[in-house]
Amino acid sequence: KLMKRNDWNMKPGEFHLTVIGIVQDLEGRFLVTRRNLDKEWAAGWWELPGGGVNAGEDSKDAIIREIKEEVGIDVSNAKGGHIYTYKNESPEEKNNYFVDVYNFVLDFKASDIKVQQEEVLEFNIATFEEIQNYEKEIGFLHYNSLKPAIDKIMKKQ
């Protein structure tokens, strides 16, 4: 079933698929972005690159596209892949979704990042401690849902 973009009028049992990319540099730091202040939802919060999966697209192609659109880097040949999926059910908001979480590790630096101006206020290549501080001070989108995936990554380092 196709749905209109941002049409959160889902019936029980209906879900849409979104993707999030945990992009890390070779030192294990995380590429994070801050949402523009004019966003209707979670304005100014920090987050990881990601978004919706388009009709006919698989989740890996979607996360590669979203990362390229939002921060201007190509992760198609990066080390890594799918590491985690979680489900969110919000019957009161009629917004149910699955999130496929990917982890990519590649050699990049701040000068390689070209943010999508309409979406992104700023970016950082952050340590996990910085991400924890963002969550406490400003807000970090999907932090609690992403914590198991980040913990899994941190154990490997």
Protein language model regions, located:
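A generic structural micro-feature
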Residues: 11-15, 45, 93-98
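A glycine-rich, hydrophobic loop/mini-helix early in the fold
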Residues: 18-47
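Nudix hydrolase/Nudix homology domain
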Residues: 39, 55, 82-157
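Acidic, metal-coordinating catalytic segment for phosphate/diphosphate chemistry
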Residues: 1-20, 26
